[in-house]
Amino acid sequence: MLGNKPIIYRKLEVFSNENNDSVDIRGGVPVLEYRESVLSPYITIDLSIIDAGTALPAKEKDGSRGTIGLLESIKLQADEKFKMILEDQYGNKIDLSKDTDLKVGKTAFATSNNRQSTVVIRVVSKEAYDNTLLENRMVNSYLGKGDIIVEEALKSLKTEKDLFADTTENDIQFNGDKRYPFEMCLDVQKVSIPVGIKSAGFLFWETSKGYNYRSLDKMFDQTGKTIKKFVETGFASQKVLPGYNGKILKSSFLRINDTLKQFEDGAYNTELDLFNPLNQKLAFQTLDSFDYNKNSTTAGDDTPVLSNEYRNKATLSLDRIKDVGQKINPRGGLADIDDTKFDIVKTSVQSHQNYRQKFSISLNIVIDADLSLSAGDLVFCKFPETSQKPSVTGSTKDSGIYMIADLCHYSTPTQAFTGLNLVRDSYGVKS
């Protein structure tokens, strides 16, 4: 264990919109917070900047010497280009130094006088701006696999970033209807089914490595993945146990199965009433947690068990018009009309359940800064059990595999941490 050390700012540079000037702000950033989330299509970075008036040489007409501050030189008035390279104590880097990576999204001025001012800025992915342009809206009709439609959306943004996508089983059709490209991606994810798994639901998000379009279930599949392991041993011990990558400095469980909320959202059992406009018939279908457990990839061995009183009882009723006949698939035939793989309504309801199940158990942990981690990664956490035994062992309930839903790298001039919001759908260590 190397001990806690600050993140090294290899590059923090902001560029003027008015000329070719740029300012290196590495020496004036007391706080930097870098964030990713599996629920966000773009990255955000919040920086506090101490502007001491030394950003650039002053260009006085009378030839007098001196310097001026960041706000006087660059002004930070709009969507300035921003470049960033970060490195942690292990040599892991986040490199967002291309011209097309980042833009200043928001500026707030905290305090100011003639000698010093404090500025708080939010930097976002350039695509957050590109997504708002009318010229980039989705206007055509799109037919194909979900991952192909997501590719089309990113082409509309003209992004140069990579896409890491799971192939979808079902062909779907969407009309553009002037959707924002990110809006199209978020709509498509709800009705996509991965190849080989009968469980709907994808996520679309950005990390420092690029864009991701992943199946919820395949995200929890451990096959072929490098999974970092962290252990909580208490503040008294600074040692990391053999076989672990780091120490959990702090943990807090935010929600351990909010069952009432799950009932209200129909996560365990939903009744779907489908009206077929072609034959004027009403069909009733039940989507329950048994189907979820049978078809889904879970993080642990033990899924929540309901009492006999409420088991297999529906808690949410949805009335929908069956989408039969509403899609023209030139590669399919008439027999495809009643194929459940093409039933967008049922698929969207199933994904609705899957999202709520996968995020049902949530906790926060803090570790030493580790820039190799990204939103969507799996980590293994070992927590001590609560007991009065002579020797404390790992908790068989709380320990196990979790997915990083949200990530924040936090750095000051003296120390740095990574905060992780972790989620999963079940308990225990999977055998």
Name the predicted role of every residue range.
Residues 154-159, 189-194, 381:
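Sec-exported extracytoplasmic/periplasmic mature domains
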Residues 118, 125-127, 163-255, 260:
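Short beta-strand-centered interaction patches in the first periplasmic/extracellular domains
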Residues 132-137, 153, 188, 376, ...:
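Subunit-assembly interface segments of extracellular/virion macromolecular structures
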Residues 110-130, 142-163:
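Glycine-rich, acidic and aromatic/proline-enriched surface loops and short helix-turn segments
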Residues 1-130:
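Assembly/oligomerization scaffold segments
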Residues 8-10, 41-43, 80, 98-100, ...:
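Envelope-exposed proteins and targeting segments
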Residues 34, 40-62, 73, 233-431:
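An acidic/polar, Gly/Ser/Thr-rich interaction patch typically located in mid-to-C-terminal regions
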Residues 133-143, 170-176:
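Second-shell loop/turn segments in exported
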